[in-house]
Amino acid sequence: MTTIAKILAREILDSRGNPTLEAEVTLDDGSFGRAAVPSGASTGTKEAVELRDGDKTRYLGKGVRHAVDNVNGTIAETLKNFDAADQQGLDRRLIDLDGTENKGRLGANALLGVSLAAAHAVAASRKQPLWQYLSTITEADVALPVPMMNIINGGAHADNNVDFQEFMVLPVGCSSFSEALRAGTEIFHSLKSVLKGHGLSTAVGDEGGFAPDFRSNVEALDTILEAIGKAGYTAGEDILLGLDVASSEFYDNGKYNLVGENKRLTSEQFVDFLADWVAQYPIISIEDGLAEDDWAGWKLLTDRVGKKVQLVGDDLFVTNPKIFKQGIDSGTANAILIKVNQIGTLTETLEAIAMAHAANYASIVSHRSGETEDTTIADIAVATTATQIKTGSLCRSDRVAKYNQLLRIEQALGSGARYAGRDAFVSIKR
């Protein structure tokens, strides 16, 4: 039976040394599931609420004891004897129990931990890997996603002068996920050598990418191109580039403040700036190119380059189906970033991905800068045919854990394993 017998939560640490919540669900048949909740650094203002204690005498106010207590008390009592195989019903019960629009009473971290742990428990009960169980819910074809590998960190993810948060390589020309992972790894090590040769730091940021103090944002792009060539790959053919601009972080009073370029730009000027980069570099994906409240700027960017570049809404959509619908209806962006903790339940996450597929928007399953060894997002990416995954660079075990899980899934699928490759960008013509 998949009836819930016990729910237990605890406070653990994430990859930045901050507390986060881990939940466990045990079923009547003894099957067991566990999930840990990630946490972001650059967050959208409309994200579901991550409940923190605020007690400055403990973990600098970042403890999650209240969220843990909510799981071990109200949530555990309410869901005891509930059928965990009814994922949609379970998540609806959690949402109703919280009773707020932003999950601020019990905490999205409390709800998400239980939601994901329940799915793990049911998969264990059915003796299925999580990706296989989830595919019975989504009814989607399974596919290995293109990894968007964040090899240079800036912005809120690093202590340097680079404004843009992530510079990524996408190995689209490879025949399998394992070959794509190898290509990314070789480029990562090549980049380390290039940085050393230029006398730059090879310290890494929150997501495992290097965080050198470049003089400008464009220097980061040029250095990556050098590393790609040195590793024996061809930029624009084997490897494409992606950016997470995270522009809400440097948007102030209607202007975009680029410290690296010493420029203060209007929305129109910043769209021109990004369009120039697209013309000069093999950039296939731009995330959060405009600020989350600059919908007019987003529309300008979409009209300007949206037919040839993937434009990803992260802070813009915050994995929220209601907000995402506004983007679809207005033709804003052409892809959505999927972060499970932005919305707070597995069901709502899957709903956002299904909406993207129906509207011919690409969906990219993503980690957060504060991660754990939990690998759930790898299984979600495969089970939903999301075609792309963002889970950081090629070092730090909290990032590599997801890549290793994808390798296991690829091996389990055997000859049926399909790598998205160049077909990953469903919203644009290639």
From Swiss-Prot:
Listed cofactors: Mg(2+)
Catalytic activity, per the record?
(2R)-2-phosphoglycerate = phosphoenolpyruvate + H2O
Q: Subunit structure, per the record?
A: Component of the RNA degradosome, a multiprotein complex involved in RNA processing and mRNA degradation.
GO biological process, alphabetically ordered = glycolytic process
* Associated pathway: Carbohydrate degradation; glycolysis; pyruvate from D-glyceraldehyde 3-phosphate: step 4/5
Q: Which organism does this record belong to?
A: Xanthomonas axonopodis pv. citri (strain 306)
List keywords of the entry alphabetically. Answer: Cytoplasm, Glycolysis, Lyase, Magnesium, Metal-binding, Secreted
Per UniProt, what is the name of the gene that codes for the protein in this document? eno
The molecule here is called Enolase
Coiled-coil intervals in this record? none
Where is the protein localized? Cytoplasm; Secreted; Cell surface
